[in-house]
Amino acid sequence: RELLEKQATGSYSIDLYSMDEIAKEERDSTYGAMVACLGSPQKIKENGTFGPDGVACFDAFKKAMLLHDKKIKYLYSGEMGGMNTMVPMLVSIIAKQQGGASIGLLDFDANGRAVPELNTSLNAARGFAPNPVGLGALPTVEGKACTECIIECETDTESEAICRKLCEIYNS
């Protein structure tokens, strides 16, 4: 709550809903996205783009989901207790400050532990490959701005390999 008070401009409110309080039509047509930082926490800190990179990532993912006629209205954390606990909150706050729509936050732990790779998540264990994947980074590569990437892969292992290589390219 204190973080929200310091980061939010103007007033804010928190509404809590149980899934059975949300109309079935909305549940069937609304999606949530896991937002997380991928790469070295030390490099992310050095780059100083922790929050804005998350917004670029979310923007890429929204575009990827539109290709599948799906809209994202909620964010959730890929892991609780580590750095990625804060990512959905920061993305929601920064996106709103940049004039974006309000993004809801889902309060649950998607994995119950730290997730070192995309292919070690509970989604992957249940057979749901991270597809599509939206990546965002603010640094430039060879003078060209490379802020958004959309990746469509068949398997979680492919997604992980491509995402890790892009982290190397973006020096994150």
Model-inferred region functions:
Residues 27-40, 120-166:
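A structural-propensity feature for long, helix-poor, extended segments
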Residues 71-83, 101-106:
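A short, small-residue-rich loop immediately preceding and capping a beta-strand
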Residues 1-33:
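N-terminal low-complexity or amphipathic/hydrophobic leaders
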